[in-house]
């Protein structure tokens, strides 16, 4: 992974297998591009923090302190501005959480903390802040680091089963 081009300092570091952004700064993205994939990722954030995972650099799955809130496309598990989870599975801040996200074409399934919250729905367009609008092309995984502290670990990307 590498820092996205920016005037800001790269604040990311790895310690004991945990990728950490201690404060707002640059986004981080893979050097490889992916078309159809399954992503497993675990994350933790402090109270009131906000991050996101951009699939192919174009579709943001929200990572935000949303414990106790009504489901929304702008809270944990939502595809920002487009798809609202059927349930809010957010844990309290400071607890490790997980996503298993499958993206095939523009169809996405999001499993948060072991429960499917978005099932095989079409993402209608790119999210604000996307790297580009070339939806038919492979793209990187981008971790948002410009909104607040966040930690990620146990990141795996595989080919989805048919």
What function would you assign to each model-found segment?
Residues 1-162:
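Carbohydrate-interacting regions of secretory-pathway proteins
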